[in-house]
Swiss-Prot record:
One of its GO terms (cellular component) is plasma membrane. Keywords: ATP-binding, Cell inner membrane, Cell membrane, Cytochrome c-type biogenesis, Membrane, Nucleotide-binding, Translocase, Transport. Gene3D superfamilies: P-loop containing nucleotide triphosphate hydrolases. Its EC number is 7.6.2.5. It catalyses: heme b(in) + ATP + H2O = heme b(out) + ADP + phosphate + H(+). This is Cytochrome c biogenesis ATP-binding export protein CcmA. Pfam families: ABC_tran (PF00005). It comes from Colwellia psychrerythraea (strain 34H / ATCC BAA-681) (Vibrio psychroerythus).
Amino acid sequence: MSKKNSTPLISAVNLTCIREERLLFDELSLQINAGDIVQVEGPNGSGKTSLLRILSGLSQPYDGQILYREQLISHCREEFHQNLLYFGHLSGVKGEMTAEENLDFNLALHGNKTQESLSYLAKVNLSGFEECLASHLSAGQHRRIALARLYQSNVPIWILDEPFTAIDKQGVASLERLFSLHAERGGCVILTTHQDLISIKPEQIKKITLDYSYDSAVD
């Protein structure tokens, strides 16, 4: 991972988002730099997941642009996605593989076969489930397998939608420490959560609040 520099990792310029004829946010601009931990806040339905999907290039805004290192992501999509880890509501876990095999598969995809998957599963409270087929595990356990990939990841941009769901207090604290370390190494973390980030220094956290004051229908 590269060291911190003055070029923003992600820039959003005048984003407008409309879903089901509702205006969620309008002319939203932001810059996310290496070292940033950005917490997106707002009530349910305010557009938090929509914003994360737009920032990750998985959804298109009604208007506005997303840039990666000052280039439109449409011009560098492959490079952008190689430097992005997105954690959404779908885990991406393969049911025909065990929990350990899912992590080994992820390591193999990224050209790194030397790290120990068992220790990562322990960090997300899945010790004892290493040899269980993922198809026999719960949805919450699938999310924990997906979260274990964070401990394997060297990509700079992490975009995480409610990463603390189904994680106990010890696991949350461990993830928060990981986020701080990732930021200190020159990465960035963009996440939604209703929890306070108590293990992260307040000066490390930037907050974006989505809370449109009226339910605006679009003609």
